[in-house]
Every structure is written in C-alpha cells, then in structure tokens.
UniProtKB/Swiss-Prot annotation:
It comes from Saccharophagus degradans (strain 2-40 / ATCC 43961 / DSM 17024). One of its GO terms (molecular function) is structural constituent of ribosome. This is one of the proteins that bind and probably mediate the attachment of the 5S RNA into the large ribosomal subunit, where it forms part of the central protuberance. This is Large ribosomal subunit protein uL18. Keywords: Ribonucleoprotein, Ribosomal protein, RNA-binding, rRNA-binding. NCBIfam families: L18_bact. One of its GO terms (biological process) is translation. The keyword Endoplasmic reticulum does not apply. InterPro entries: Ribosomal_uL18_bac-type (IPR004389), Ribosomal_uL18_bac/euk (IPR005484). The keyword Methyltransferase does not apply. Gene3D superfamilies: 3.30.420.100.
C-alpha cells in the first residue's frame, strides 16, 4: 500500500473513532475514479440504514464520475435517509479531501434535508 493511501486510511480511522464517541448515524462516502457511493450507517455501526450510488439504475445512464453525478447521489441518499427516519448524521468523508465530488455530494445531501 502506498503512503498516500495509508495516510487516507489513517485519517478515516481517526474520524470514525470520533464519530463513534458522538453516537450519531454517519453518512459514509466512498469514491472511485468512475463511481461514488454513499451509505447512512446506524449509530451503533452495525447496519446500513440507507444507501445510494451511481450504480443505481436511474443514475447509471449518464456520466457517473463527475460532480453532477455526485450531487444526484447526495439528493437520493437524503431522500432515502429521511424515509428511513434519519435526519441528523455525521459526515464521514473516508479520509478524502472535502473538495470536488465529495463536497458536491455533501452539499446536495444538505439541500435534501439532512443535517450534519
């Protein structure tokens, strides 16, 4: 594993430990060059309450690796989380910089009604 990936994983581990202390559900984001994924994980950390990604049927048709796709995933995860009864989450960016696609997803989720 290269140093860049190791430091990202280390940052993510520290952030997740802090979120566990808070005891709230977390919106976990993962990105690859081609897709972006989002999951709302329960406060206990044992189950996924809601999930959305660019692999979903309605989002798969267009371009999946850009900011527009990330904001579509953000809107979708906000809808699904609210339908599951979750309105407040901690944003887990998985060690990725809060920039570009990760920021677009977070902004769209906030507009969709999730509180961070």
């Amino acid at each position: 594993m290269n140093a860049k990936k190791q430091s990202r994983i280390r940052r993510a581990r520290r952030a997740r430990a802090k979120m566990k202390e808070l005891g709230v559900s977390r919106l976990c984001v993962n990105r690859t060059p081609r897709h972006i994924y989002a999951q709302v994980i329960s406060a206990e950390g044992d189950r996924v309450v809601a999930s959305a990604s660019t692999l979903d049927k309605d989002l798969r048709s267009g371009s999946t690796g850009n900011r527009d796709a990330a904001s579509a995933v953000g809107k979708l995860i906000a809808e699904r989380a609210k339908a599951a009864g979750v309105s407040t989450v901690a944003f887990d960016r998985s060690g990725f910089k809060y920039h570009g696609r990760v920021k677009a997803l977070a902004d769209a989720a906030r507009e969709g009604g999730l509180e961070f």
